[in-house]
Every structure is written in C-alpha cells, then in structure tokens.
Amino acid sequence: MTNGLKKYFNVYVGLSILCWVFLLGIDLYTIHAVIAKIDIFVNDFFIYLLLSLCFLFTFLSFKLHSSKSKNRNFLEQLWQVFIIGAFTIFFSLFIKFFLFLINDTGFSNNIYLVNVLYHVNIGLIVVFVANAFYVWRRMNLYQKSEITHQAWYIFEMLVLLSILTNFFHLEFSSLPFIIISFPLVIYALILSFNLKWVAFLNYSQKWQSILLITLIILISITFVQQIYEQNQTQILVVDLINNTFIMAMFGFICLNSFISLLVLFFNLPTSSVFEQKFGEVMIFQ
C-alpha cells in the first residue's frame, strides 16, 4: 500500500473510531438523561448518523485494504477471515462471560456498564463483517467477467445504501425490514455461486478451507445469537437485531460460506482423482 493510500486508510480507521467514541458518549448521556429526568435530549438523528458513519468508515477502510492487497493465496485469505473472526468472537464471548460473573452483583443492573460493553461488541461485529465481506468479494471476483464485476458493484452499493435504514425504526419481524433485506439476501445468494477460486485448490487445501469456512459460519451464528440474546435481556439505545445492514451482512456471510462448503465437498473427489493421475504421469515420465 502506497503512502497516499495508507494515509486514507488511517483516516478511515481514525474516523470510524471517533464516530464509535462519540456514539458511546451520546448513548450514555441519553441513558443518564432518562434516569435523571433531564429534559435536554440528543435527537435520535445524531445517534443514527454516528452509527451509520461508523459502519461506513469501517467498511471503507477494509475496502481500501482489500483492493490494494496483493495476496493471491485463497487459503491465506480464508485464514484472514478466521483469525479476525476468532479474535473478535473471543473478546465478545469474554464480555458475555464477564457479565455472567457479575450477574449476582450490583454491577449486573448497571445500565451504563452494560451499554459500554454492548458498544464494544458493536465494534467487534462491524470489524468482523466488514473484513469477511471484502475478503469474500475479492475471492468471488477472481477471474471475473464484466457482468460479474458490474453485478458486484451494484450489490456493494446496495449494501452501503442499506446503512441508511439506521434512520428508520424498523423492527426485525416487520414487513418493511423484510422487504428491504430480502432483495439483498437473494442478490447475495446469486453472487455466491461465482466460486472459480475453488478449482485452484488442491485436495489438502480444500479440506483446510472446509474447516476454516465451517468455523467462520459458527462465528457468525454465535454473533447473531448474542445479538438476539442482548435484545431479549438488556435495555439498549442501539439494538443491532433491528439493523437491516448488519443482519443482511450476516446473511451474506453465512450464505456465501455455506455454498462454498457445498462446492468444496462436491469438488473433493475430482481433486483426489486428478492429483492421483497427475502423480502417476510424473512417475511414468
């Protein structure tokens, strides 16, 4: 990455962190205003604006990093998704374990502490989905056609535009939520079948990929489960379960991962036979 691009990358990362910090501060003040019955409230617009900007700048930073990466090793790219996923889910589960430990203490009812930890969880989730999205994008665009490239460009724009749904109060089970998220999921499903990279893996690499993708799916499901649990048990200013953008991203990651698993499994026998025949030819020569 050149110095100019690195500067943009650092700016995006810095802005995403700054938006997250301001979002946390405003949410804590909102909670305090409700508890103390203070009449001065921060308009919800600013909360959703900061949340949206945090999402946007995080995604732009990973987009820039992915576009300038020269790594062509597909297995290493899957490792990148897994390692960042493992790192984020470890801290997320640690937060959950910490809340479990203090469950019978006075801290368990501290709404400030709960929301601080929840905002840390938001940051971890955004990092995971942004990294996974752009790694899968890069892999799916391997040996791309012009149509595939345009289709992915449209999908990426639709994904980023879905961030604007933060400004609307959409319930997870509501019809507007389904109407907005359903086309994104269907579009993601169609794009997920462009898996030319699978053919360039040998038998051993395919098994490693199957293991890594399975773990990525488990990480995604664990994050979604935590989002649901926090929605049911905690009082939150920002609730991710009603966030079209985040839930659509998890839908894309799980769909893309599941289809990749199926394709890898179906390609295992052909890889084994090809490598065996290739070995016989080399011995004969």
Language model features by range: what are they?
Residues 285:
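Short, hydrophobic-rich beta-strand element in sensory/regulatory alpha-beta domains
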Residues 9-18, 36-53, 118:
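Hydrophobic transmembrane alpha-helical segments in integral membrane proteins
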Residues 1-19, 77-80:
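N-terminal membrane topogenic signal
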Residues 265-282:
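Short, charged amphipathic alpha-helical "coupling" segments at sensory-output junctions
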Residues 2-4, 31-39, 53-82, 87-234, ...:
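Juxtamembrane segments at transmembrane-helix boundaries
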Residues 12-21, 151-158:
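Short hydrophobic alpha-helical membrane-embedded segments
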Residues 41-47, 114-117, 239-253:
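Hydrophobic alpha-helical transmembrane segments
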